[in-house]
From Swiss-Prot:
The keyword Repeat applies. The keyword Transferase does not apply. This is MORN repeat-containing protein 1. Pfam families: MORN (PF02493). Gene3D superfamilies: Histone H3 K4-specific methyltransferase SET7/9 N-terminal domain. MORN repeats lie at residues 39-61, 62-84, 86-108, 109-131, 132-154, 155-177, 178-200. Keywords: Repeat. InterPro entries: MORN.
């Protein structure tokens, strides 16, 4: 019984094979004791040596060269946890040297690596398709490099830890160019910009913005400007900074001159009470800072022009034509109306021409030979006849008559009309009364995303004296005081109640 029982399977314990040892030489497969690693490939003296494939239980793997049991040489490594794959040179298990990294999230890198990180010169395409070519340090863009952004902008210059810093040139997709200093990815320091609109700025930049940027438009001259009926005049404009200094670092903004006529006149200052506008020619009222409203009125400046923009100092010159949209602007655009040239002609307005625009040069601009024309079709002046009827003992105070029934503002009180050339000049001139000049920033596209607020000048058209020369606005504070002294007989209109 005992002899028979020794040979039965039930009487023997489970058979355990001794652990396999790695192959000595040649090709072999070895599963490590912890079963996480599996190697298939060439062996030499019991070590992985030559070409082989090391598989990890989580799905990661390396396939390539081995030297004395270590991953060294050319190979391909895939990380299951990230999905990234590197093909290139390895030293002691880490990417080292030159190779290509493909990212699961999108994009790839080709270039030099050290200890598994981008180091040295390389070519990077990110998940958004943006391309960088240049120096890397500690896995970041660092040193000189070029970048093509998703929106089409191109940067060529210095980088510090993935940010543009130092000196660089940015060429935007819209045609704008910045050359100068950077800090923390924004314009900072001395630099110049040639904007696609034609605006140029050369000077100091702080946190991405010009340190000497224009913030407002100012029309030089007295508080209330008087011009003779039918006479051309000049308008000088300055762009000022917040603290009142002229923005001399800036050139190229396109300024448009336009005018409005006072919608309700006061009897003390004009015989014209207001303009009645036909229903088909209704205009939106323009609010002015003078306490009254006005409606658009035609103005011309035939001597004005819009020269091509000049590049910033140190940059290449460029001639950018005035955007076509600017040529079609008209007075109604001041309050948001959108009219085509054909629509303006149908309504009696001439389409806007380049003569009404002027480019700024070092913070200053001048409009010469500015002239207020006759009222457009559909504008009918009404006369305030209070003063006339007081003298003539006429009807009750405040009577209103449309032009053509009583003596008009162009006629002497006695009713006799001037003859010949004088009559023609008056017919082609603006009526006596209260007007407003407006200077508007129409730079397209707006410089750095914003336009300057419009500037206003109170204008009074008075009867022309014989031999009176054209009016020219002088500059400086002395001009305002001397003008007011010379015209002290003209009272200022009271604020509306």
């Amino acid at each position: 019984m005992a002899a028979a029982g020794e040979g039965t399977p039930s009487s023997r314990g489970p058979r355990r094979d001794p652990p396999r040892r790695p192959p000595r030489n040649g090709y072999g497969v070895y599963v490590y004791p912890n079963s996480f690693f599996r190697y298939e490939g060439e062996w030499k003296a019991g070590r992985k040596h030559g070409h082989g494939k090391l598989l990890f239980k989580d799905g990661s793997y390396y396939e390539g060269a081995f030297v004395d049991g270590e991953i060294t040489g050319e190979g391909r490594r895939h990380w299951a946890w990230s999905g990234d794959t590197f093909s290139g040179q390895f030293v002691l298990g880490e990417p080292q040297g030159y190779g290509v990294m493909e990212y699961k999230a999108g994009g790839c890198y080709e270039g030099e690596v050290s200890h598994g990180m981008r180091e040295g010169h390389g070519f990077l395409v990110d998940r958004d398709g943006q391309v960088y070519q240049g120096s890397f340090h500690d896995n970041k863009r660092h040193g000189p490099g070029q970048m093509l952004f998703q929106n089409g902008d191109k940067y060529d210059g210095d980088w510090v830890r993935d940010r543009r810093q130092g000196h660089g040139v940015l060429r935007c997709a819209d045609g704008s160019t910045y050359k100068g200093q950077w800090h923390s990815d924004v314009f900072s320091g001395l630099g110049s910009m040639a904007h696609c609109s034609g605006v140029t700025y050369y000077g100091l930049w702080i946190n991405g913005h010009p340190a000497e940027q224009a913030t407002r438009i100012v029309i030089l001259g007295p508080e209330v400007m008087e011009v003779a009926q039918g006479s051309p005049f000049s308008v000088n404009v300055q762009l000022l900074q917040d603290h009142g200094e002229i923005a001399k670092s800036e050139s190229g903004r396109v300024l448009q001159i336009s005018a409005g006529v006072r919608y309700v006149q006061l009897s003390a200052y004009s015989e014209v009470n207001f303009f009645k506008v036909d229903r088909d020619n209704q205009e939106t009222l323009i609010q002015t800072p003078f306490g009254f409203e006005c409606i658009p009125y035609p103005v011309s400046s035939p001597a004005a022009g819009v020269p091509g923009p000049r590049a910033a100092k140190g940059g290449a010159e460029a001639d950018v034509p005035l955007p076509r949209g600017d040529l079609e602007l008209h007075l109604g655009a001041l309050h948001g109306q959108e009219d085509t040239p054909g629509g303006l002609l149908a309504r009696g307005h001439a389409p806007h021409c380049p003569g009404a625009c002027q480019r700024v040069e070092q913070g200053c601009a001048e409009f010469t030979d500015v002239l207020l024309g006759p009222p457009p079709p559909g504008y009918h002046p009404f006369l305030f006849l209070d003063s006339l009827h007081k003298k003539a003992g006429g009807r009750s105070r405040g009577g209103l008559h449309p032009r053509g029934t009583p003596p008009t503002a162009q006629e002497p009180p006695g009713g006799s009309r001037p003859e010949g050339r004088a009559t023609e000049e008056q017919a082609a001139a603006a009526h006596l009364g209260e007007y407003v000049l407006m200077i508007r920033d129409v730079t397209t596209p707006p410089f750095l995303g914003r336009r300057l607020p419009p500037a206003f000048k109170h204008l009074r058209v008075v009867a022309k004296r014989a031999g009176q020369p054209p009016h020219v606005l002088e500059e400086g504070p002395e001009a305002s005081s001397s003008w007011q002294a010379a015209h002290s007989c003209t009272p200022e209109p009271p604020a509306p109640r």
